[in-house]
């Protein structure tokens, strides 16, 4: 799983199901693909979204700011700063500074995530705030590790509140990952279209998959409901590749 796919998975796992989730998924996909480069408009859109908690907006704002190239002097947004202040608790700020010092020594996404997971959500948010306010700098990869650790903690608490049995991999994250991977597989199918006779058939399969993912995000589904989705998609893609004599290795 690529780094950006992992980030997309974790961030979407904390967004409540509904039409807005499908919209945010599309925005993230566009941002990570370099298709959306207007950070100012993106932040204005995010600020006015209903339903999302201030912290979720703050995390999304942080991710957009990390990913979208922007002018050096672009002003930081108050709604993100307020969300990432650790509820104004000085203890959170103290812990955030300690965490930041540890993160400065990390160079990998997974290393940063591992270190961050031992801190509270408030301390993690405060640490993001430090970086967002340019009071500290880490590599983008390390910052994404911090983001995913925060999302995992939030998803864990949401999962516990659903009174479902906690397994080693959080079902909300696993469910979201299936949908993100299914969506990416559909995109890969579309990119391979060309002008062959089978192109229309494959575009149809990809389109159906996209619609299914969007519907699942919009109406909300149980985490186990996406289990067969990715496998069905991969099967369709591999069957198509086999007919076309294309190497299948890349999409396994």
Swiss-Prot record:
Similarity comment text for this entry: Belongs to the influenza viruses Matrix protein M1 family.
Keyword RNA-binding: yes
Gene: M
One of the GO biological process terms: viral budding from plasma membrane
Source organism, top-level taxon: Viruses
Region annotation Membrane-binding: where it falls in the sequence: 1-164
One Pfam family from the record: Flu_M1
Annotated Gene Ontology cellular component terms: host cell nucleus; membrane; virion membrane
Subcellular locations according to the entry: Virion membrane; Host nucleus
Name this protein carries in UniProt: Matrix protein 1
Subunit structure: Homodimer and homomultimer. Interacts with NEP. Binds ribonucleocapsid by both interacting with genomic RNA and NP protein. May interact with HA and NA. Cannot bind NP without genomic RNA.
Membrane topology designation: Peripheral membrane protein
Role according to the record: Plays critical roles in virus replication, from virus entry and uncoating to assembly and budding of the virus particle. M1 binding to ribonucleocapsids (RNPs) in nucleus seems to inhibit viral transcription. Interaction of viral NEP with M1-RNP is thought to promote nuclear export of the complex, which is targeted to the virion assembly site at the apical plasma membrane in polarized epithelial cells. Interactions with NA and HA may bring M1, a non-raft-associated protein, into lipid rafts. Forms a continuous shell on the inner side of the lipid bilayer in virion, where it binds the RNP. Determines the virion's shape: spherical or filamentous. Clinical isolates of influenza are characterized by the presence of significant proportion of filamentous virions, whereas after multiple passage on eggs or cell culture, virions have only spherical morphology. Filamentous virions are thought to be important to infect neighboring cells, and spherical virions more suited to spread through aerosol between hosts organisms.
Residue window of motif Nuclear localization signal: 101-105
Keywords: Host nucleus, Membrane, RNA-binding, Viral matrix protein, Virion
More about this protein: Most abundant protein in virion. When expressed alone can form virus-like particles in transfected cells.
HAMAP family from the UniProt entry: INFV_M1
């Amino acid at each position: 799983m690529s780094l950006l796919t992992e980030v997309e998975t974790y961030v979407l796992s904390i967004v409540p199901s509904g039409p807005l989730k499908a919209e945010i998924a599309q925005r993230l996909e566009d941002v990570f693909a370099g298709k959306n480069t207007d950070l100012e408009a993106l932040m204005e859109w995010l600020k006015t979204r209903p339903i999302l908690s201030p912290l979720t907006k703050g995390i999304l704002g942080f991710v957009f700011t990390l990913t979208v190239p922007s002018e050096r002097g672009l002003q930081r947004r108050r709604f993100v700063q307020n969300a990432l202040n650790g509820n104004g608790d000085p203890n959170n700020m103290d812990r955030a500074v300690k965490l930041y010092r540890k993160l400065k020594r990390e160079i990998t996404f997974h290393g940063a995530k591992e270190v961050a997971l031992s801190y509270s959500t408030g301390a993690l948010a405060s640490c993001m705030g430090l970086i967002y306010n340019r009071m500290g700098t880490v590599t983008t990869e390390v910052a994404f590790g911090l983001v995913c650790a925060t999302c995992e903690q939030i998803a864990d608490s949401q999962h516990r509140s659903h009174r479902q049995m906690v397994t080693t991999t959080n079902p909300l994250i696993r469910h979201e990952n299936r949908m993100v991977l299914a969506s990416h597989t559909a995109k890969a199918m579309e990119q391979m279209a060309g002008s062959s006779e089978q192109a229309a058939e494959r575009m149809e399969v990809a389109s159906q998959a996209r619609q299914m993912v969007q519907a699942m995000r919009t109406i909300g589904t149980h985490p186990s409901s996406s289990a067969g989705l990715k496998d069905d998609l991969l099967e369709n893609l591999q069957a198509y590749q086999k007919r076309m004599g294309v190497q299948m290795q890349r999409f396994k």
